[in-house]
Design a protein with these regions (language model features):
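Catalytic domains of carbohydrate-active enzymes, especially glycoside hydrolases
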Residues: 144-167, 265
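Active-site beta-loop-alpha junctions enriched in small/polar residues
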Residues: 49, 94, 132-134, 160, ...
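Acidic/aromatic-lined carbohydrate-recognition and catalytic surfaces
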Residues: 167-220
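Active-site-adjacent "subsite" loops/lids of carbohydrate-active enzymes
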Residues: 124-126, 135-140, 183, 210-265
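Conserved, mostly hydrophobic/aromatic
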Residues: 84, 129, 152, 160, ...
Length: 265
């Protein structure tokens, strides 16, 4: 017997998925589609810094748009709810306008300005110099930093950030995780450099990537496996680094200790 038309569907979808905490690593968490016959457009964004998914398909002779955070099929994520429990999905925004991409982008921009958290940057956006891009590329030393600090101050910068590499000699990629200053790079300590930054009227900053430990980090070698993401009985690593599991209170204590030490010392 032929299925009634109202229940028919193709079982095909156009879908875009992002997995992980880098929410724009492959695609931006937004989309736009035009109806050229009706001269309308549909646009959307997913307001989430983790895994997300959207899809366009057909059901019961209608097209549908599904916009969401992580899913079980695409991201292997789910949440069981007991009777009386509830769960709020990640926030999304969906809008309709005429068939103008520029108009849709304008409406989305206006919406973003409305939902932005009030903060001092709205009125006073500081000028920040970071020593990584087009400068030291993760190879800082006292000798290299001082002339850059002078130049940044002369340009009117308000913050000066010492980026990656301050914590280890040589190739440091797979040994990060303890966040101790490297005396080979800063013979008199990194405080000499941060004090010099302050003497030039700027606020110092340092790069921290607290969510990872390199596979050759001594602390990672001595830490128990439950500090890290584990799959099939082994630590998960990507590009020679382990990912810390912040569900473990010991991991949070470690991170708090690092921040307190870096800020106060």
């Amino acid at each position: 017997q032929t299925q009634p038309g109202v229940y028919q569907r193709t079982s095909q979808v156009f879908e875009v998925t992002n997995t992980g905490n880098w929410s724009s690593k492959k695609y931006l968490p937004l989309g736009y589609i035009e109806n050229t016959q009706a001269h309308t457009s549909l646009f959307w964004q997913i307001e989430h810094n983790g895994s997300w998914h959207y899809e366009i398909g057909d059901q019961n002779t209608h097209f549908y748009l599904c916009v969401s955070g992580p899913t079980e099929v695409q991201s292997h994520w789910f949440k069981n709810l007991a009777p009386g429990e509830s769960f709020t999905s990640v926030p999304v925004a969906v809008g309709v306008t005429d068939d103008s991409f520029e108009r849709a982008v304008g409406e989305l921009t206006g919406y973003r300005r409305l939902i932005r958290r009030p903060n001092r940057d709205n009125e006073n956006l500081p000028v920040i110099f970071n020593d990584y891009m087009n400068c030291l590329f993760g190879d800082p030393t006292t000798e290299k930093e001082l002339p850059l600090i002078d130049a940044a101050a002369a340009c009117g910068c308000e913050y000066y950030v010492i980026d990656a590499g301050w914590y280890a000699p040589g190739e440091w990629w797979d040994s990060v995780g303890e966040w101790q200053e490297c005396r080979e790079r800063f013979p008199n300590g990194i405080k000499e450099v941060t004090d010099y930054i302050r003497s030039k009227g700027m606020i110092p900053g340092v790069w921290l990537e607290l969510e990872v430990m390199g596979i050759n980090c001594e602390k990672a070698k001595n830490a128990p496996d439950d500090w890290f993401f584990v799959r099939h009985g082994r630590r998960v690593f990507d590009r020679s680094r382990y990912q810390l599991d912040f569900r473990n209170p010991a991991v949070i204590s470690h991170v708090n200790e690092v921040i307190d030490r870096v800020v106060n010392e």
